[in-house]
Amino acid sequence: MSDRIDRDVINALIAGHFADPFSVLGMHKTTAGLEVRALLPDATDVWVIEPKTGRKLAKLECLDSRGFFSGVIPRRKNFFRYQLAVVWHGQQNLIDDPYRFGPLIQEMDAWLLSEGTHLRPYETLGAHADTMDGVTGTRFSVWAPNARRVSVVGQFNYWDGRRHPMRLRKESGIWELFIPGAHNGQLYKYEMIDANGNLRLKSDPYAFEAQMRPETASLICGLPEKVVQTEERKKANQFDAPISIYEVHLGSWRRHTDNNFWLSYRELADQLVPYAKWMGFTHLELLPINEHPFDGSWGYQPTGLYAPTRRFGTRDDFRYFIDAAHAAGLNVILDWVPGHFPTDDFALAEFDGTNLYEHSDPREGYHQDWNTLIYNYGRREVSNFLVGNALYWIERFGIDALRVDAVASMIYRDYSRKEGEWIPNEFGGRENLEAIEFLRNTNRILGEQVSGAVTMAEESTDFPGVSRPQDMGGLGFWYKWNLGWMHDTLDYMKLDPVYRQYHHDKLTFGILYNYTENFVLPLSHDEVVHGKKSILDRMPGDAWQKFANLRAYYGWMWAFPGKKLLFMGNEFAQGREWNHDASLDWHLLEGGDNWHHGVQRLVRDLNLTYRHHKAMHELDFDPYGFEWLVVDDKERSVLIFVRRDKEGNEIIVASNFTPVPRHDYRFGINQPGKWREILNTDSMHYHGSNAGNGGTVHSDEIASHGRQHSLSLTLPPLATIWLVREAE
């Protein structure tokens, strides 16, 4: 039992400086009897009501005009369910007292959250509609162990931090409160007095929906239902599957022509999805769709890691978009950013007045390239927040893969830092051991919980084993972007063909390390911004040669071992750099048939042909699937190789990277017979010169390049051709 409340406690409670509201508010046994206390600012009268009968049991005395009420319930000794009849501004309202409910988080959940091993922390933390003791409302939970006081504020309480202070679970540092009547769609934030005594308003790290910039409140929103992984979607991610990825920034793929406004998720489902399917792509990759305050970050500086951005609609609208993609046979990859977060005061930065999510030392916790903060992966609750987020997108939205951004910046402590600007690890090395363990753990958990979904790493160094299993010392990613291949091949293609013979190795070097990782060949958004020019504009020569070079390059890329990725606009050879504030240049495809149509048709045919022939994708990561036929003809800039499937069927790929047609070009082959040209980037269908081999060509029993049989081909200028052997 306790005595009646002290005046200093009332003052602290009303001032918002009292950390343990449940010790004061609600129903308590005292020496005077069963006492009910309530903090109800602006109320004039308060009664305790029996819910079943509506009978008034006692009127509470106003002990402080600022809204503190208390009263003893006559003839009652044991706790019972009650309601409060409150008169505000002359009108009576019947409410349930949030301080009559017991602890919300179960002991096992609290233990797992503290340990950092809760697989799905989002099922406990955040805002969740619930029914407790027959009362509907919302339970709120937030991790802020160093805050002095935390309250829920929102549309349900006039954004008044005095009205709903939360209970601190000291064993976990989590604050919790069930608010009767709070419901889906209402805005809320957490108001806290932080570790330094400063008043802060924070959005919910686990909010499932959030306001669009410039507003920053969270929305009460229930968890979406789980999405079942189908066998078809699992197969589409496998190493032997054809994977051709269309990378998209939803805000600039296409816009309304009358006002330059974004398409909604549902409009994108109706326009983007069928377009990507028609183009023959197998996967859509979305630049980050997590809520973010700055359009110019392209989503790579998220503040709402669990909330799809409202720029294009609601959470359910985004689910509709994903469902439409799946119905069209497209898997969906989400760019995921666990490497850093922005410094905006309303979000994770100094969340409870301490460096809770980030490192305190800027040599570990600040990324000077992007003016962002770096997660403290060594803190269990932080890693749990991120691992749970990865699982959330896959399980609750049906995301099929996560492309992890800026992995190199995570795994190296000296990334983009000079001497003295970074702190070595415990062994004196430059590796961020905590980040490495976080990535391994994330990939392990995803492999166990949602097998079939995969991860891809954008890793720009030669860190070993990025896409190798953890038991082999790897990070456990399924795929890694081959940025070295991308840089080498683009450096080669931008050269005048006269000088390419001196840089032949830029095209041949990639195969030397090709089987060290499971590579994706990316022509991503990063290659068409910041003055790098468009892919088309990097090609040398006049307009005809630029387009011919681009077509030859695409033919080479789609044939080379590795999965494919192409950023939007490149499929029809957009001439300018990407602008996130405007639509792609779809007008280039208006009017009569032109070179842009030709490139678009080529990319579609590349996708369809690549998908149809197993030799082009089945053994991307097995040396048996590739063999050079001509690798050393640098004087004529000719390269020829075969792709092979598990059954030994071959496709010959020949590229001529000069504008000079090569007639009667003889080279040795493995399999004699009749070979049919199935793709020619110089075809008139693509607005080329239409040089080629008339459809089919027969091999000769003439030795060449160390082989008994050979083919004699016409290699079109600035072109790549594919040939398949026909059955006799």
From Swiss-Prot:
Domain of life: Bacteria
UniProt cross-references to Pfam families, sorted A to Z: Alpha-amylase, Alpha-amylase_C, CBM_48, GlgB_N
Catalyzed reactions: Transfers a segment of a (1->4)-alpha-D-glucan chain to a primary hydroxy group in a similar glucan chain
One of the GO biological process terms: DNA damage response
Pathway assignment: Glycan biosynthesis; glycogen biosynthesis
Role: Catalyzes the formation of the alpha-1,6-glucosidic linkages in glycogen by scission of a 1,4-alpha-linked oligosaccharide from growing alpha-1,4-glucan chains and the subsequent attachment of the oligosaccharide to the alpha-1,6 position.
Family per similarity comment: Belongs to the glycosyl hydrolase 13 family. GlgB subfamily.
UniProt-recorded name of the protein: 1,4-alpha-glucan branching enzyme GlgB
Lineage per the UniProt record: Bacteria, Pseudomonadati, Pseudomonadota, Gammaproteobacteria, Enterobacterales
